[in-house]
Amino acid sequence: MSERNDRKVYVGRVVSDKMDKTITVLVETYKTHKLYGKRVKYSKKYKTHDENNSAKLGDIVKIQETRPLSATKRFRLVEIVEESVII
């Protein structure tokens, strides 16, 4: 059971929900430059499994690492933290 707790958990924004049962999540992280101490922003996109197609474009979601579900999917949707506001 402790193995499951070692899996990576990220919070990011949904940038694509066009695929069936799959969303693309943009995760932004900050790292400090060793020499200059400036914070540098890094971003990466993850394909994420969304079983019920519940996440929509612009939502803030929490994703967790899991076994490989396809050639590119390695994460699954845990929860929708904040829903996007549609104007």
Curated annotation (Swiss-Prot):
Gene3D superfamilies: Nucleic acid-binding proteins. It holds the Pfam family Ribosomal_S17. GO terms for biological process: translation. It comes from the Bacteria. One of its GO terms (molecular function) is rRNA binding. CDD domains: Ribosomal_uS17 (cd00364). The keyword Transmembrane helix does not apply. Keywords: Ribonucleoprotein, Ribosomal protein, RNA-binding, rRNA-binding. PROSITE patterns: RIBOSOMAL_S17. The keyword RNA-binding applies. GO terms for cellular component: cytosolic small ribosomal subunit. One of the primary rRNA binding proteins, it binds specifically to the 5'-end of 16S ribosomal RNA. PANTHER family: 40S RIBOSOMAL PROTEIN S11 FAMILY MEMBER, SMALL RIBOSOMAL SUBUNIT PROTEIN US17M. Part of the 30S ribosomal subunit. Belongs to the universal ribosomal protein uS17 family. This is Small ribosomal subunit protein uS17. It comes from Staphylococcus carnosus (strain TM300). The gene is rpsQ.
